[in-house]
Amino acid sequence: VSRGLGDVYKRQDKELIFTETSIGMWNDGRNLEKRLMEDMEETALGTVNNWCKAVIVWNLMLDNERGPNREGGCQTCYGAVDIDRSDYKTITRNSHYYIIGHLSSVVKPGAVRIGSKGYTADGIMYSAFENLDGTEALVLLNNTDGTKNITVNSGERSFTYEVPAKAVASFR
């Protein structure tokens, strides 16, 4: 997904927004561990680290029969959240729910990406942001099989955190 975005970014007169990404039967959409790692790496962090200003996830909510949909539309998609048609109360949270949740919990409207390089030697991928109120946000992914200790430095403040294997963490 994120490959080639740097070339498009060279057109400074164009705003990059990554649109219409989905999960479904074709990409093991119910496998939360696999999808969360891949979607956070490619769809969320991979796009914003390559100059995209936003990511639009399709579909936000579907039912457990992958609907409603229109003729010719995706018949095999899952939503960020799927709701059980038998009671309209039971929900299944899928990977896109969690990528939206991690980013929106710390990155606020109008925020700008700041000083982040993406992958590190320790197998951590991250994006850092500055919100309009001056707070800073960090979303990171440990896509390795081991726990990683990280230290985050921001001016005069710093903290250390132990990131579990195959985990996403958000800080503000």
Residue ranges and their predicted role:
Residues 12-15, 50-55, 109, 134:
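Loop/turn elements at helix/coil->beta-strand transitions in domains of secreted/extracellular proteins
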Residues 1-9:
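Single conserved hydrophobic/aromatic residue that forms the stacking wall/gate
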Residues 162-172:
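C-terminal beta-strand-rich structural cap/linker in extracellular carbohydrate-active enzymes
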Residues 10-11, 21:
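Long, internal scaffold/assembly segments composed of regular secondary structure
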Residues 18-99, 115-116:
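Aromatic/acidic polysaccharide-binding cleft in carbohydrate-active enzymes
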